[in-house]
Amino acid sequence: MEQGESLRIRVVMGKDRISELPDALLIKILSFLPTKIVVATSVFSKQWRPLWKLVPNLEFDSEDYDDKEQYTFSEIVCKSFLSHKAPVLESFRLEFESEKVDPVDIGLWVGIAFSRHLRELVLVAADTGTGTAFKFPSSLCTCNTLETLRLVLLILVDISSPVVMKSLRTLHLELVSYKDESSIRNLLSGCPILEELLVIRGEDSDIEVFTIDEVPSLKRLTINDDHDGQEFWGYVINAPSLKYLLIEDLRCPGFCLNAPELMEANIFDGTSITNDNFLGYLTSVKRLLLNLSPWKITYPTGSIFYQLVSLEMYTREIDWWDLLTLMLEHSPKLQVLKLTDNCVKFHKNGLPGGKWNEPKYVPECLLSHLETFVWRRFDWGREEEKEIATYILKNARRLNKATFSTNPVNSEELDKLKERRKVHNELDGVVRASNSCQFVFKFDTSYHVSDSS
């Protein structure tokens, strides 16, 4: 058999196998692709030709289309909507340059998508340097089927009256701007079952206070805000059902929170918060992660973490142990303590700072509850940190396991190896309050050898 004939047979066989797939499976596969590629598959065969019209997702990015196309980007999107036949539109994603797309067209497309019982809407307005923002008005905020809404980049949220989004559960506001504070309030108040809110803000501030209120169903809140200008005060949050709080960056001075049902809080950076009661807002949590400076955070008098069972703290900040001592003294039921040194090429030995002082009384959590102690990337050269580790081992009566990890060391660095072996032996030799405590030492492979200290 000639090579060409063999190839033709293999192609035909391959084509036959594809044809045997049920339409439902083909549509499922196509739903993971951008619409431009999905439409292109219609040339494969007669079976594929109508399938793209039934794919429940539409995704357009203006960068995928150039000026050499037969039709403009807006015309292509319009034609796609006119040809599309899926009874339910699961998602509509549109990435565009605001100055190249008529806002009227966007409103038309969103309106058509809403009429198809749209469940997820993603609008990404690329910033090309012109500063022209796409205005997201109240007229685009009436949809009873929408479950997820993401607004990204150069979009102006201008909402003069409460929206109607009875099914919206997830809302992401990523680097968008706001006409005024009432636009935020009108957006949130019209989402009666909203469960997840993500707010990302940049350096430009257009409002003084970001208020999250009238959202009794909110369960998850994420804030990432690196704006530190004087004109922006901060956040006022009233979320009676909030369970999870994540703050990735927060440089504003003000922060007020009412979240009596909060179960977990991860605070990665709140270095500019000056509210003396910041930690007091978190006393209901069971799991807490803190990466804060003890110099800038005041522990609120009388605040007790009665529910806290798991605490993770980062140890980069100067005198971080002062905050640790306070947390141990005020967390009587703590069961898990994790300390993490997130320094890579940053050495703490030369930092100023005071000595660590033992608590006047052994904290109740050490006497009765602490079971797991983990110290990731333990600093072998800092006496204060060895003292803290020794103190916990000596006083944690119910400790089951103590794990110390360190970043790897080159075999040529004999001095470091000797020092770590010495400290390892010292810690392993500590007379522990718990006879059943297992001592574990291991290397943390997530750090590169070149970054070891």
UniProtKB/Swiss-Prot annotation:
Which keywords does the record carry? Leucine-rich repeat, Repeat
The question of whether Repeat is a record keyword is answered with: yes
Q: Which InterPro entries is this protein grouped with?
A: F-box-like_dom_sf (IPR036047), F-box_AtFBL13-like (IPR053781), F-box_dom (IPR001810), FBD (IPR006566), FBL13/AtMIF1-like (IPR050232), LRR_dom_sf (IPR032675), LRR_FXL15/At3g58940/PEG3-like (IPR055411)
In this chain the F-box domain maps to 15-68
What are the cysteine partners in each disulfide bond?
none
- Cite the repeat ranges for LRR: 89-111, 165-190, 215-239, 247-270, 282-307, 331-358
Keyword Repeat found = yes
Which segments constitute the FBD domain?
Answer: 355-406
One family from Pfam that matches here is F-box
* PANTHER family, A to Z: EMB|CAB62440.1-RELATED (PTHR31900:SF34), F-BOX/RNI SUPERFAMILY PROTEIN-RELATED (PTHR31900)
Provide the protein name: F-box/FBD/LRR-repeat protein At4g00160
Annotated source species: Arabidopsis thaliana
